[in-house]
Amino acid sequence: MQRQYNESHRSVMVQETLHYLRPTYNGVYVDGTLGEGGHTKAIIEATSGKCKVIGLDIDEEVLAIAEQNLKEFKENVELFNVSYVDFDLVLESLAVDKVDGFLLDIGVSTYQLKAKGRGFSYEIDEPLDMRMSLSGSVTAADVVNSYPEKELARIIFEYGEEKRYARRIARKIVERRPIQTTIQLVEAIKAALPPQERFRRKRHYATRTFQAIRIEVNGELKGLRTALEKFPNYLKPGGRIVIISFHSLEDRTVKHFFREQDGVTLKILTRKPVVPSVEEVSENPRARSAKLRAAERI
């Protein structure tokens, strides 16, 4: 079932991705977060249709959109409804030992934020869900309504980087249970924060808590680390890893892994994260927090 959705997704940092991924004729690439297919399309076009992209996405609804968007490139793509964490199983099923590059564009897609019924957005009143895979067993409502207050506070503190108010937010959530919708959760967060704190923040006051719960529901940081550890084993010498992240926890995970492997299995190509141009941010405000890091197999 494809939900009501009227806004197209704009892939972030496409030119920077091509620069660091360096797609070549006859290359084989894994786009582990296919989304609506924008980066994959750019990779294929950069090689004049002379490469292959294995596209993965855990979200079956988004994958269906990508399949439509990439139908003119069906000879160049193979699409799979799996998490990028399991890319190795896909490669084995295709009898592919090594690839020329891995790309991850981590974060919530425009579709997930805007399509009705997904429960990712604090702007739309709908049931709390936040599962990137609809076959996932744990929803945001499960986390919000069943986790002990202390565990909720830890998640909001660590994953949401809500340093000062994590305990207050967790306490208010527990007081207001059951919380079944996104707006009910927003109201609990609002009640936990002093008015001056809400007005002081540049981003919506619910952003950090929503991020924390989404990361917990989908096991995002653990999955990222697991995939990173496997990537070098499936990269040809000179093959590249390009990761685009949207919050500091993801970026820190990538940075630390690259540093651990620098000179061992990888050579870091970006000593500092690459950020979007001023022009891109003005045209696509969602790009403002994106950071790109890249490394090459040695």
Swiss-Prot record:
It is an enzyme of class 2 (transferase). The keyword Transport does not apply. One of its GO terms (cellular component) is cytoplasm. It catalyses: cytidine(1402) in 16S rRNA + S-adenosyl-L-methionine = N(4)-methylcytidine(1402) in 16S rRNA + S-adenosyl-L-homocysteine + H(+). Keywords: Cytoplasm, Methyltransferase, rRNA processing, S-adenosyl-L-methionine, Transferase. S-adenosyl-L-methionine binds at residues 37-39, 57, 91, 105, 112. One of its GO terms (molecular function) is rRNA (cytosine-N4-)-methyltransferase activity. Gene3D superfamilies: Putative methyltransferase TM0872, insert domain, Vaccinia Virus protein VP39. It is found in: Cytoplasm. One of its GO terms (biological process) is rRNA base methylation. Belongs to the methyltransferase superfamily. RsmH family. HAMAP family: 16SrRNA_methyltr_H (MF_01007). This is Ribosomal RNA small subunit methyltransferase H. It comes from Kosmotoga olearia (strain ATCC BAA-1733 / DSM 21960 / TBF 19.5.1). The gene is rsmH.
